[in-house]
A protein has these predicted regions:
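Phosphate-binding site recognition
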Residues: 1-334
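A cross-kingdom feature that marks ATP-driven nucleic-acid transaction machinery
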Residues: 300-459
Length: 459
């Protein structure tokens, strides 16, 4: 199975593996984001002796036995006997005095549950062998809150972790590596549904159309990913009904706290705040404010950041009764097709364009690097309306306005001029304009205006 992307994280792990002395690494991120595959791929690319152990939700004795078997297989000697996990780990720290070694404890929170004082055990071993052992210990886990707690001052391991990798979903560009044969337009559509989770993207069948992949994987009864979102939520949140209500309201386009409270049917404001806080910690929802008014709570809003969750709650969860009694193609045509093309994908395209600009900014390819990117809140005195520009960057010279259009016709000169005039009416200190178009342009770029075709995003 081919491995895609994650170049920076692989380089970080290789530096850790090649360090002369002891190193402690922490890798965490949401389920399915590719932590284990990243580690396994990095281990395949190093000559350092390694043991990869997936901790189990059993007992200390069972985990100790299983790790002992791995130890024997790695070093080709009879299975040793250890009466505790501490004794086994002590043996490995000792062994790494003679020869560097990598030990990966994947799903570390499971081990932490069954071994009393596990963090303290590791702390004592790290302190004892810090100057003499060359063990590279990697702790990995999907329970983000638990893994982050290892870095807190009150935790025994505080100050002992040498490298931390908070693994995020891939962006649109790395995700497209999983489906290279699709057109650029279809890459946008696929990312809009399956996002940057490697597990989802590996399931995409290049022999099928985008529509067929969606039906096959998420929009039909018993589809491979039909229960993926709800199962993930249930594993993290006890009051799943409240989470479902909030997600459905967000998927319908409500983003302000007051709107969510009135449209989600969550019983109270504290209950809503609790659900939103948990969803934000799970990194499937985020709170964002306009870059020109970041401290104004009234203008802040919440959005779903996990694309599969957004698609699921907008179409599958909302119309599940219809989906279960209809032909899948008829269901898609009636409840998904038009809204998907006219509303859903164009909104997701804006996020793809933001990611493109961040990639360009990090690579030093923009004329002036920006400090912030986000929405811009405006008042239009001529029409006496207010609203938000979806993609604006801020740098020392002022603001740059971007307009993303995922439409089947080229952008014309008059459309571009209309957008520029609207920006100027707001009084925004905008010194440059750029337009990103799925279908190209029937226009010429004037001074201070950049025209970016879709194919440039995938170069």
């Amino acid at each position: 199975m081919k491995f895609y992307g994650r170049e920076k994280q692989r380089k970080d792990l290789h530096r850790l593996f090649l360090y002369e002395g002891m190193q402690i690494g922490l890798i965490y991120g949401r389920r399915r984001v590719g932590k284990s595959e990243l580690i396994k791929q990095s281990l395949r690319e190093t000559d350092v002796t390694s043991i990869y152990f997936e901790c189990k939700q059993t007992t200390e004795q069972n985990n100790t036995e299983s790790l002992s078997v791995l130890l024997a297989d790695t070093f080709h000697f009879p299975k040793p006997s250890f009466d505790s996990m501490e004794a086994l780990l002590t043996y490995l720290f000792e062994a790494a005095k003679e020869k560097p070694m990598i030990l990966v404890l994947d799903e570390y929170p499971y081990l932490r549950e069954v071994v009393q004082g596990m963090d303290s055990v590791l702390q004592a071993l790290v302190d004892r062998y810090r100057d003499t052992s060359a063990l590279k210990l990697i702790l990995c886990g999907s329970y983000v809150d638990v893994m982050k707690s290892l870095l807190l001052r009150e935790n025994p391991l505080y100050g002992r972790v040498d490298r931390t990798i908070d693994l995020k979903p891939m962006d649109y560009y790395e995700s497209a590596m999983f489906y290279p044969t699709f057109s650029d337009e279809d890459k946008v559509r696929l990312y809009s549904v399956f996002g940057g989770i490697p597990y989802y993207n590996r399931l995409i069948n290049s022999q099928l159309s985008v529509r067929e992949n969606i039906i096959e994987l998420i929009a039909s009864p018993d589809a491979r990913l039909e229960n993926e979102v709800s199962m993930y939520l249930k594993s993290e949140i006890s009051k799943i009904n409240n989470a479902n209500e909030v997600f459905e309201a967000l998927a319908r386009g409500f983003s302000k706290y007051s709107d969510l409270l009135s449209h989600s049917h969550v019983s109270s404001s504290p209950a809503l705040a609790d659900v939103l806080e948990k969803l934000i910690r799970m990194e499937v929802v985020k709170k964002e404010a306009p870059i020109n008014d970041v401290n104004n709570k009234r203008k802040a809003g919440y959005i779903i950041t996990d694309n599969l969750s957004l698609f699921y709650y907008r179409y599958v969860f909302r119309y599940s009764s219809q989906m279960n009694v209809m032909d899948s193609d008829v269901f898609y045509d009636r409840y998904i097709r038009d809204d998907f093309e006219k509303q859903y994908v164009p909104r997701q395209f804006e996020e793809i364009c933001r990611q493109y600009l961040i990639r360009q900014n990090r690579a030093g390819k923009l004329p002036i690097p920006f400090d912030r990117i986000g929405k811009y809140y405006y008042d239009d005195p001529q029409t006496r309306t207010n609203g938000e520009f979806d993609i604006v960057t801020e740098d020392p010279n002022g603001y740059v306005f971007y307009e993303a259009k995922f439409r089947s016709e080229p952008l014309t000169q008059s459309m571009i001029q209309q957008e520029i005039e609207q920006v100027r009416r707001t009084g925004m200190n905008c010194y440059r304009y750029a337009f990103i178009s799925r279908s190209g342009f029937d226009a010429q770029a004037d001074e201070g205006v950049e025209l970016i075709p879709l194919e440039k995003l995938y170069e």
